[in-house]
């Protein structure tokens, strides 16, 4: 299983003082050097953490894979096509939320989705949808032309005991179903050093995307050690 590191909260810390440090690009390079297989950033419409110049710097510097999380808007479609990350992930976005609160509502946007995706894929960019781990969302993602899905693990992260076990099984079944539908599978949201290890039991999940937990750990031990510790856990 591969590790993709979300560096949004490096930008959050920088923006707290509106100065140049810490630099998200430098953080991304440290993560790559330490074994991360990809870098994730979310260019939100309100630019609350990652900004346009960060994205340009990441595109110039990232050597593994750059995953641009974005809302389904004309502005973000244009930016994606101009920037050409290896991957874009469509996520829901609300101005009042602290972080992405759930999966992309494919049912609601389905009629526009294929047309939105088409020019992005034509630019040589893979497309992922951040979805709830259920068969209906997976079916619609496949029909819309998505290359892969990122299964939302937030509910798993918030639960404990038998409820968490049940949610894990839901994710396991969804991952297998997605692969059967011809989609590649990654997972993310709320994953941390305490709850990640069970995902080693789901071979269909090729990669996990981790941001807040890893950056929080890096505040104490540094990015290289935080990445290495997570890599040890995901095996």
Curated annotation (Swiss-Prot):
Entry annotation: catalytic residues: 42 (proton acceptor), 69 (proton acceptor), 189 (proton donor)
GO molecular function: pyridoxine 5'-phosphate synthase activity
One GO cellular component term noted in the UniProt record for this chain: cytosol
Compartments it resides in: Cytoplasm
Superkingdom as given in the UniProt entry: Bacteria
GO aspect biological process, one term: pyridoxine biosynthetic process
Catalysed conversion reaction: 3-amino-2-oxopropyl phosphate + 1-deoxy-D-xylulose 5-phosphate = pyridoxine 5'-phosphate + phosphate + 2 H2O + H(+)
Record keyword Repressor present: no
E.C. number(s) listed in UniProt: 2.6.99.2
Residues noted as binding 1-deoxy-D-xylulose 5-phosphate in the record, renumbered to the chain: 8-9, 44, 49, 99
InterPro entries: Aldolase_TIM, PyrdxlP_synth_PdxJ, Pyridoxine-5'_phos_synth
Annotated positions for site Transition state stabilizer: 150
This protein's pathway: Cofactor biosynthesis; pyridoxine 5'-phosphate biosynthesis; pyridoxine 5'-phosphate from D-erythrose 4-phosphate: step 5/5
HAMAP family per the UniProt record, alphabetical: PdxJ (MF_00279)
Matching PANTHER family: PYRIDOXINE 5'-PHOSPHATE SYNTHASE
Quaternary structure note: Homooctamer; tetramer of dimers.
Family stated for the protein in its record: Belongs to the PNP synthase family.
Physiological role: Catalyzes the complicated ring closure reaction between the two acyclic compounds 1-deoxy-D-xylulose-5-phosphate (DXP) and 3-amino-2-oxopropyl phosphate (1-amino-acetone-3-phosphate or AAP) to form pyridoxine 5'-phosphate (PNP) and inorganic phosphate.
UniProt-recorded name of the protein: Pyridoxine 5'-phosphate synthase
């Amino acid at each position: 299983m591969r590790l993709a590191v979300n560096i949004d909260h490096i930008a959050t810390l920088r923006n707290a003082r509106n100065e140049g440090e810490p630099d998200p690009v430098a953080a991304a390079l440290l993560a790559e050097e330490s074994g991360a297989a990809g870098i994730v950033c979310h260019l939100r419409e309100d630019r609350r953490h990652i900004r346009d110049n960060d994205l340009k710097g990441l595109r110039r510097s990232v050597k593994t894979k750059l995953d641009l999380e974005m809302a389904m808007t004309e502005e973000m479609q244009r930016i994606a096509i101009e920037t050409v990350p290896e991957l874009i992930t469509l996520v829901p976005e609300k101005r009042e939320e602290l972080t992405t609160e759930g999966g992309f509502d494919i049912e609601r946007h389905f009629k526009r989705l294929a047309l939105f995706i088409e020019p992005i894929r034509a630019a040589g960019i893979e497309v992922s949808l951040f979805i709830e781990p259920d068969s209906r969302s997976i079916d619609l993602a496949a029909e819309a032309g998505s290359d892969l899905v990122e299964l939302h693990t937030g509910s798993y992260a918030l639960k404990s005991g038998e409820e968490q076990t049940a949610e894990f099984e839901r994710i396991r079944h969804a991952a297998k179903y997605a692969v059967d539908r011809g989609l590649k599978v990654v997972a993310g949201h709320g994953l941390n050093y305490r709850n990640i290890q069970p995902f080693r039991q789901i071979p269909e999940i090729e990669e996990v995307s981790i941001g807040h937990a890893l950056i929080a750990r890096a505040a104490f031990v540094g990015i290289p050690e935080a990445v290495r510790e997570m890599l040890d856990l995901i095996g």
